[in-house]
A protein has these predicted regions:
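Glycine- and small hydrophobic-enriched segments that form the cores of compact globular domains
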Residues: 85, 114-119, 131, 135-138, ...
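Glycine- and acidic-residue-rich phosphate-binding/metal-coordinating active-site segment common to enzymes
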Residues: 144, 150-163, 167-177, 182
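Alpha-helical support elements that line or immediately flank enzyme active sites
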Residues: 123-134, 179-187
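Functionally critical mobile loop/hinge segments
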Residues: 184-291
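Acidic-glycine-rich active-site phosphate/pyrophosphate-binding loop
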Residues: 87-104, 139-158, 203-211, 246, ...
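Generic N-terminal targeting/processing segments that precede catalytic cores or assembly contacts
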Residues: 1-108, 131-132, 241, 248-291
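Conserved phosphate/anionic-ligand binding catalytic regions in large, soluble enzymes, centered on
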Residues: 107-125, 169-174
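Active-site-adjacent structural elements in folded domains
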Residues: 107-110, 160-166, 218
Length: 291
């Protein structure tokens, strides 16, 4: 995918009178030299892995540190008992984000979308729609192409690495990708998709990467939920016609600049933020003594 800006993607779709997913797919095929059948087969495989991660989730599984596991089923049970807010979809999104992020912490197979630390965001917003029959596999794969296209632009213009840009580059990027996937899936115009991405990333600008004990668990697992719910809200706003004052490309550029301004303590080193709290330090010391 050779697009270097969101505006290039939108212009390609407009000039060829094709959907955003088709414009991104054509660009990817031109760069990768793959056949369309092969490319789609690979995307379907990624979607199937996302589904398998959720399907194979074990409520009893715990990470080696003991910091992660068992929370997704708590959310599901609370919703079944009428104790949750936000309705069926939001409860499912929350549970699915936790499931995938917990599986990552427990060394299970996940799809890095775009990173392992943010792997729960994108599948969380799509899996409930697939299960309810609101979206078929082909439509979801088209939405994944759109998500990938925007992710590629973020990678090209800024970064996807927490060590370089903080958590805004991981969960923030994943949230933007999930927002555009939802917007496209629900029939949003290319401009609405770009607005959804801009809102989602803009909302998480400045989010630091501060993993306790250097593990992708606390606060990473729960931040996947924030990224997913943020994506839903931003997609809803964009689909309603709500615009964003700052263009998507400029939001991405701002994220890159903010990342470069963050202290190294707040970029995956486990030296600042929550990792530097008394409890965070105590957890790290305890785990170090046990290893």
């Amino acid at each position: 995918m050779s697009f270097l800006s969101c505006e290039e993607m939108l212009a390609a779709a407009r000039s060829q009178n094709i959907s955003l997913s088709e414009a991104i797919l054509r660009s990817d095929l031109a760069e990768s030299r793959l056949t369309e059948a092969h490319s789609r087969e690979m995307m379907h495989h990624l979607w199937q892995v996302m589904q398998a991660t959720s399907r194979d989730y074990d409520p009893a599984q715990r990470s080696r540190s003991g910091l992660s596991g068992g929370d997704a089923v708590k959310v599901e049970q609370a919703h079944q008992e009428g104790k949750s807010l936000g309705g069926d979809y939001l409860a499912a999104v929350t549970a699915e984000a936790l499931k995938t992020a917990e599986c990552n912490a427990c060394m299970k197979r996940i799809v890095a979308a775009p990173t392992a630390g943010s792997c729960g965001v994108l599948p969380a917003v799509l899996l409930p729609l697939a299960r309810s029959g609101e979206a078929d596999e082909e439509s979801i794969c088209d939405a994944l192409y759109v998500a990938a296209g925007f992710g590629q632009v973020i990678a090209a213009r800024a970064t996807l690495a927490g060590a370089e840009g903080g958590c805004q580059a991981e969960v923030g990027a994943a949230s933007a990708m999930a927002a555009v996937a939802l917007c496209h899936l629900k029939g949003g115009a290319p401009e609405q998709c770009a607005a959804a991405a801009a809102m989602a990333l803009g909302n998480l600008l400045g989010l630091v990467c501060d993993p306790v004990a250097g593990l992708v668990e606390v606060p990473c697992v729960k931040r996947n939920v924030v990224g997913a719910v943020n994506a839903v809200s931003c997609a809803n706003m964009a689909l309603a016609g709500v615009d964003y004052a700052i263009p998507c490309d400029e939001v991405i550029d701002a994220m890159g600049r903010v990342g470069s301004l963050l202290s190294p303590d707040l970029r995956e080193t486990g030296q600042g933020g929550l990792a530097a709290t008394p409890t965070g330090v105590r957890i790290a010391q305890t785990l170090a003594e046990q290893s």
